[in-house]
């Protein structure tokens, strides 16, 4: 039951599960009436959910908080696509930062994503996040009017032995 689920927080405030679930990573997000939860074993997970509402200042917000290349991309989209483009990038960035444990205060401009309209991927990031290739991202459409993203850090491959 919810009363007996050992929900804890690490030193940065990132949620985690206590024993006997301490080998399972967890993360959650809510927006409006929506809630998403991510669980993972042997990976760090992060998830974000956002209501896809009007964002008349999407391009200006991207210019202020995102990597310059992402702001350029949003501005190159048709005006009516700005809110969706902005929200997809925001969700993916927040999911990566939540998985890593830094959160938004780390800086949304310290990671750069590419969105081809179908898939999104991390192409560059601050070394504190590891290498871009260590991260996987999946965009979600959990319900009409919502956009989400799930990020997980792949386990490091074991070194080759001779």
Role assignments for model-derived ranges:
Residues 1-162:
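Core catalytic alpha/beta fold that binds nucleotide/phospho-ligands
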């Amino acid at each position: 039951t919810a009363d007996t689920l050992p929900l804890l927080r690490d030193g940065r405030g990132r949620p985690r599960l206590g024993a006997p679930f301490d080998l399972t990573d967890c993360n959650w997000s809510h927006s409006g009436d929506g809630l998403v939860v991510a669980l993972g074993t042997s990976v760090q997970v992060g998830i974000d959910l956002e209501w896809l509402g009007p964002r008349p200042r999407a391009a200006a917000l991207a210019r202020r908080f995102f990597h310059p290349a992402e702001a350029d991309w949003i501005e190159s989209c048709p005006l009516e696509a700005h809110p969706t483009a902005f929200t997809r990038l925001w969700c993916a960035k927040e999911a990566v930062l939540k998985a890593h444990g830094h959160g938004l205060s780390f800086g949304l401009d310290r990671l750069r994503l590419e969105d081809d309209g179908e898939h999104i991927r991390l192409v560059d990031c601050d070394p504190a996040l590891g290498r871009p290739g260590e991260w996987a991202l999946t965009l979600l459409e959990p319900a009409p009017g919502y956009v989400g993203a799930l990020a997980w850090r792949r386990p490091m491959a074991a070194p080759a032995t001779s």
